[in-house]
Amino acid sequence: MRYGIIGGTGLYEITGQRAQTMRLETEFGSCTAMILKLAGEETAFIARHAPDHSLLPHEINYRANLMGLKQMGVERVLATATAGSLNDRIQPGDLVVLSQFLDFTKGRAYTLFEGKGRAAHVDMTEPYCLHLRDDLLKAGTGMGEALHPVGTYVCTEGPRFETAAEVAMFRALGGDVVGMTGVPEVVLAREANMCYAGLALVTNWAPGISQERVSHEEVVRAASQELEKVRRLLEMAIQRGRERSERCSCQQSAPI
C-alpha cells in the first residue's frame, strides 16, 4: 500500500464506498485508518480530526497518524487542510498546492526522535515532495486560476482564529494561506522518510481582510461545497503517480 490520504476539516471520508477500518497501535499511541480503493490503488485514509471532528488542532496525535501509515507500508501521503486566504489573488473556493510553510505553533510534539538518544536534523529546504506536488498540478490541468501551483502555508496553534494584527504580520512575511494543522505533520512525514504533499482548500478570507467574521461552521459549510473537486483531484493525482517507481529523496531523509 503506497498511498495514504489525511483528510482535513470536512473530508471525513473519501469515496462513499464501504471500507475496512483498522485501529493501529504505534509507539506514540493509536490511530484509526480506513482502507479503500482509489484510482485502482489500495489507499489508507485517516480523518485528521477524527470522523466526528472531535479533535482540536493541538489535540491531534500527528505522530501516531504518520507512524500508523508508515506501519501500513505507505510511502506517499496526500494531505488536505482548510485554510484562510492571506493573498488577494487566492479566492475562497480555490485550491493551493503548498510549497513552503511558516510555523507559528507553540507546544506540539514536533519530532519522532525525541528520547531516542541521537541527533536527527532533517533538511526542510523543500518541505513538500516535488514529485507529489507535480502529480497534483498535472492532475489539476484545466482548473486554471482555481488551482495555485505554489503557496506558503502559515500554521498557527489554534484553536482560536487569528487576530487582524497577526494576519497583517503573516501577509508581510509572505504567507499565502493560514491554517492550524499543517505543522508538525509535514515535518514528521519527512522524518519518517515519506513523501508528503499538502493541498489547501481555501474556505474564507483570513480575519481582518474582509468585513465578514470567521466561524467554524462557515468553514465546514464552505469546505463541503468543494469536497467533490478535492476528491477528484486526489484520485487523478494517484492515477498519475502510480506508474512512477523511482525512489524519491524524501524517502532517504532521516535515520529512522
Question: Where do the model's predicted regions map?
Answer:
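Alpha-helix C-terminal capping segments
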Residues: G68-G73, R89, L173, V187-C195
